[in-house]
């Protein structure tokens, strides 16, 4: 068993060469000096509360003692600065508290309660809301820069924003904008015109009562002129302008149905049968004139005139082509038979190259030309000729009857 010799060391020897040992600026030295400055024998007691004034007084003493003992002013200067900052902060806090108490004293109890509640909410919000760092602010500014710009509303020319929009506070207060002067002027003008109209109507009625009797046309004209002063009436509609439109509408011919077409070969049995059926259809419909188109367009049309009188039919057909007229003559027996089956007897029929109206027109033209020639000859006969009186007397005679003739 090995026994080590007991080493007797002191506190001063252990901390002599170490920088981490107890120095003059340690907390224990500061407390010891502070206790000595406050009282030599600890007169205040261990449980006594230290005030700011006591700290300032102790700081002044400590600074002097430190300078006298060690000659290093660094610790004393630091202590003095700390005490000065604490004193300034305390003075500012006291000033703020004094002002707040003065403001609270001026408020009513209800307002005081509301103010305290608002201050408590603000303090809680400040505690809960963390302060934004520089990085967060930079990110927010970048996001705002990326947002699209809001379009700026350009006011219309001759129009002010005050005329178009009404402020929200004014609406909440119930302040409505006054009517523009132009609208007031318009209303006053309309009232003035209304008064003029009533005055003119009253004047017209007075004139009618006192003066000579006015015709209804004059009274209507006066009322119309009074109404024109207020507002312009619509354009008058004249009957003369409407009559030509009506006459032109009535003068338009009615749409005529297209003539049926005989598509069968000309002169064939099918063609004769189709022709007879078409004529029978005309008689049933009561048509007095009709047209039939032939299949080759070069053949033209067949004009038919039909007259019915007590189940007696008179038929006239016109075609400019000779072979078409021959085909019509060949179809007459079949047509006569079908009419007889329907109880209609074909009395007179004619087929020609000109219509009956054309024949009448040509005959009337011939008669008029003959009459013109006769009138010319008569005019020539009426011309007075120079003849002896004996010849004129012989031509007239003496009124006696010659019994020997």
Curated annotation (Swiss-Prot):
Supply the gene name: fliK
Record's compositionally biased regions (Low complexity)? 350-369
Q: Which GO terms describe its biological process?
A: bacterial-type flagellum assembly
Residue span of region Disordered = 172-209, 350-379
Domain comment in the entry: Two-domain protein with the central portion of the sequence acting as a hinge or connector between the two.
Pfam family name, one: Flg_hook
List the biased-composition ranges (Basic and acidic residues).
182-197
Q: Kindly provide the name given to this protein in its UniProt entry.
A: Flagellar hook-length control protein
The similarity comment for this entry is:
Belongs to the FliK family.
**GO terms for cellular component:** bacterial-type flagellum hook
- Which terms are listed as keywords in the entry? Bacterial flagellum biogenesis
